[in-house]
């Protein structure tokens, strides 16, 4: 209707609950999807390489934390949840003990890596999956597709909880 007379577009930005802390500590941010994620923390006139090397040396000698709020988070529940994870990941999930987590790689149908992340077993049929920031929405769609079209007989529910959880 308006053609090229649309004006400025609104681009939503997601920030972690500790975004202000990152700003106060001079973080240089990078866009990660809709998220603003800290890339490094320069001191004075440090360039990125110097700041990253300083941070890495400090973590090796002391301790470090990382704001992982931007990672995708998916809640997976149902009696067939372990079997479902067995089918969508390259590694086994049936015997993962409750209270433990496992790193997993998810492939596309052509065998190329689609996404990776950790999945924790919260109870016998309840899992918490993390995805990469960039692929969070695509992984959720991928899981929903397989549950609705490929394996409709599996009794599993998936729900994005990305906006309900923060992580450090």
Task: Specify the residue positions occupied by each region the protein language model found.
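Glycine/proline-enriched, intrinsically flexible loops and inter-domain linkers
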Residues: 1-168
